[in-house]
Amino acid sequence: MQTLAQNLTSQGVDASLTQLIHTLANTSKEISHAVRHGALAGVLGATEQENVQGETQKKLDVITNDMLKDALKADNTVRGLASEEEDYIVEVGDKGEYLVCFDPLDGSSNIDINSLVGTIFSVLPAPTGELTESSFLQAGRKQVAAGYVLYGPSTMLALTTGKGVQLFTLNPETNEYLLTTEAMSISKDTGEFAINMSNQRFWEAPMQTYISDLLLGTIGPREKAFNMRWIAAMVGDVHRVLSRGGIFTYPTDNKNPQKPYKLRLMYEANPMSFLVEQAGGIASTGYEAIMDIEPSEIHQRVAVILGSANEVKACLEYHSLDYSEEPAL
């Protein structure tokens, strides 16, 4: 099996990006160690702080954020970073080539129940000149690398540099990432969907109708049985989609009219969309490709629909219909 280093060399990834990927991968090993120790290390539970999203921070949110921030600040390829747990961008150096956006511990609410969590990251080119928030506001198409690390029964790294998606598994004996899937590919068709059904009454009409039709199974217009899956961590749900197909969505809702979207564009939706598209899937808001969005701010949120190409297309057809007229009585 190829090591991560050998694989990056064989793909012709340049030296500076290779260095940055190793920084992220090596830090993920430290995070994996912290996650595994859990209650034994006293890192479970919440802090008394909230992040910029207004979410209560878990102890491991803060710990993993500091791990990544410290590692990236020591990497001379990095110009700046943005994190879910940081209110503002962090300037690292004036000569780095890359900007890094990350969610240090996606699904952290799962930590206290010993369920799946992960790290998501996006790498963008650093523009010249003064570093400001606008330096980060680049469409997802500009990403030069993206990936996630899943901390589960085994620790796995999914990575793309624009040449497909490679999956690596951390060997616990050698502490090396080894290539276990050379090219992840999402099946075009699926019988699985992932959505938080507790929000059903708050969704827009297109998603209400789409999910209702899936639930009707063989007696509905889709004439096919579907199973629902929900891990409550984007990293886990997207990993399942990459591994065996499916559609994952966190759609627009009016539960809180001031926050119609849940997932963050820069360090959740964009990197996951890059991976999904590189594996042959589609990633959309319902109305436009996620990676075509021109960001307006670093913590911007968006609706997300991604996964198996034919099923995402079917969902998008519902979003193209006119729901403005009341049905005739």
From Swiss-Prot:
Its cofactor is Mg(2+). Its EC number is 3.1.3.11. One of its GO terms (cellular component) is cytosol. Keywords: Carbohydrate metabolism, Cytoplasm, Hydrolase, Magnesium, Metal-binding. Binds 2 magnesium ions per subunit. The keyword rRNA-binding does not apply. GO terms for biological process: fructose 1,6-bisphosphate metabolic process; fructose 6-phosphate metabolic process; fructose metabolic process; gluconeogenesis; sucrose biosynthetic process. Gene3D superfamilies: 3.40.190.80, Fructose-1,6-Bisphosphatase, subunit A, domain 1. Its main location: cytoplasm. Mg(2+) 1 binds at E84, D103, L105. The keyword Protease does not apply. It is found in: Cytoplasm. Mg(2+) 2 binds at D103, D106, E268. One of its GO terms (molecular function) is fructose 1,6-bisphosphate 1-phosphatase activity. Pathway: Carbohydrate biosynthesis; gluconeogenesis. Substrate binds at D106, G107, S108, S109, N196, K262. NCBIfam families: PRK09293.1-3, PRK09293.1-4. Belongs to the FBPase class 1 family. This is Fructose-1,6-bisphosphatase class 1.
